[in-house]
Swiss-Prot record:
The keyword Transmembrane applies. Keywords: Membrane, Transmembrane, Transmembrane helix. Its main location: membrane. The chain crosses the membrane at residues 7-24. It is a single-pass membrane protein. The gene is PAU4. It comes from Saccharomyces cerevisiae (strain ATCC 204508 / S288c). This is Seripauperin-4. It is found in: Membrane. One of its GO terms (biological process) is fungal-type cell wall organization. InterPro entries: SRP1_TIP1, Yeast_SRP1/TIP1_CWP. Belongs to the SRP1/TIP1 family. Seripauperin subfamily. One of its GO terms (molecular function) is structural constituent of cell wall.
């Protein structure tokens, strides 16, 4: 017969290995920071494409914090705090490759961090 303490220990071990999940609003700063992290990484990986997009759309501007993060190869997440959620959404969804490249990468990064979003 299995002891109750053995079952409890097994359940605790399983719970400890399962990744914690958090459900938060899409406008939450934690979501914004993950989105911006993916965005900055994408700009770094496809800089020429972003330069061409900027040249074709000169009114599409980026906050100075994003530009600094792109060219500062250290930890940039603290630079990106305080950017308004609507500005984050405008930037990441405003490029033609949002659906094909950014959205899947953002979803993967949020999932990896155990973050799930709900509509505001």
């Amino acid at each position: 017969m299995v002891k109750l303490t053995s079952i409890a220990a097994g359940v605790a071990a399983i719970a400890a290995t399962a990744s914690a999940t958090t459900t938060i609003a899409q406008s939450d700063e934690r979501v914004n920071l993950v989105e911006l992290g993916v965005y900055v990484s994408d700009i770094r990986a496809h800089l020429a494409q972003y330069y061409m997009f900027q040249a074709a759309h000169p009114t599409e501007t980026y906050p100075v914090e994003v530009a600094e993060a792109v060219f500062n190869y250290g930890d940039f997440t603290t630079m990106l705090t305080g950017i308004a959620p609507d500005q984050v959404t405008r930037m990441i969804t405003g490029v033609p490759w949002y659906s094909s490249r950014l959205k899947p990468a953002i979803s993967k990064a949020l999932s990896k961090d155990g973050i799930y979003t709900i509509a505001n």
